[in-house]
Amino acid sequence: MCSGESGVRVAPDGEDADRMGEALVELLRALALMVVADGEGARRIGRVVARGGNPATLEIAARAVANSPLVKTALHGGDPNWGRIAQAAGGALPGTAPLALDIDIEGIAVCRAGAAVAYDEPALAAAVRGEEVEYELGLPGAGAETEVFFADLSHDYVSLNAEYTT
């Protein structure tokens, strides 16, 4: 594919290029998930999907949620603590007051415009106990989207990293 030795030529414009691009994105996404799942002591995988109008802002918010130790430990414990998600995203976006943030966890709305909404707590608690949990962030605007994958922060992770020296 890279060397050109196969003799296959794909025109940059057209259906073949589109199909090849889609297949490549699917392959790279699967590889990224494998890397995350192979993390030290990882038990669960989180996926943050952020949608809104500013791609840079979405990336900042999604990465802040994915990198938050509190969100990672909530994921590990199967805790649908959406306040940790709001804190991580809001803390990464200073000057957005109050943060016009919508949050869904596993498709269940828990926060709209920065405020709690009524939801089925037992259904949400059951939904976050799976091996993969999706967190959706909605920020002002439309048209852009980003996704970030992350692993939970487990007791095993702490033990593995505390037991060796460099």
Name each model-derived stretch.
Residues 1-166:
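A structural signal for small-residue-enriched, beta-sheet-centric alpha/beta enzyme cores
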